[in-house]
């Protein structure tokens, strides 16, 4: 499963997932630009929010998060949404993942689409490993990345 805005790089990656036989569900409205109709079979053509989004994230076997290439030093909001929902996420590798995750980021990230496809297929065949990883990450995110934590962090920055 994935959701969000499509752009050329992301569209090519999603097409590669489908071409490799991965069952993909794509949420969000069809954009006027950068859309490839080969994604039609995966596209749910539905914008998701709130409880529905949380339910779909948690119910997905794997949430695929390929971040915008401009996010070289950071992660996107989806990274926090997915990990905070308890879902299993596979995302683009970023060096900052070492600081954000309680596990080796290599376990839940990819540096190429081929590596991403390989890891998706691996984790689909190893659900218990997927559950253990997502549970560990979820607990870490609840302990460290809630809005309460963010507010305290901002207040500390402001009043230094």
Feature roles, as predicted:
Residues 101, 120, 134:
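Short, flexible helix/strand-to-coil boundary loops that buttress conserved ligand/catalytic motifs
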Residues 124-158:
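A charged, aromatic-enriched C-terminal amphipathic alpha-helix characteristic of glycosyltransferases
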Residues 51-52, 115-119:
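Short acidic active-site motifs
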Residues 35-37, 118-121:
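Short, charged, surface-exposed secondary-structure boundary motifs
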Residues 107-113, 123-127:
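Conserved acidic donor-binding segment of nucleotide-sugar-dependent glycosyltransferases
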């Amino acid at each position: 499963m994935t959701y969000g805005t499509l752009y050329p790089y992301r569209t090519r990656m999603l097409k590669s997932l489908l071409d490799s036989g991965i069952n993909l569900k794509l949420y969000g409205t069809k954009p006027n630009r950068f859309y490839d109709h080969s994604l039609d079979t995966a596209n749910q053509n539905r914008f998701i929010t709130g409880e529905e989004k949380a339910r779909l994230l948690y119910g997905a076997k794997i949430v695929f998060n390929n971040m915008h290439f401009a996010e070289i030093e950071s992660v996107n909001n989806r990274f926090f949404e997915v990990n905070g929902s308890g879902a299993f996420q596979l995302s683009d590798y970023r060096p900052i993942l070492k600081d954000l995750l309680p596990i080796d980021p290599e376990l839940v990230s990819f540096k190429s689409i081929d590596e991403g496809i390989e890891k998706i297929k691996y984790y689909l065949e190893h659900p218990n490993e997927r559950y253990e990883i997502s549970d560990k990450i979820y607990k870490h995110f609840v302990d460290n990345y809630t809005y309460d934590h963010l507010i305290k962090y901002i207040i500390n920055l402001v009043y230094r």
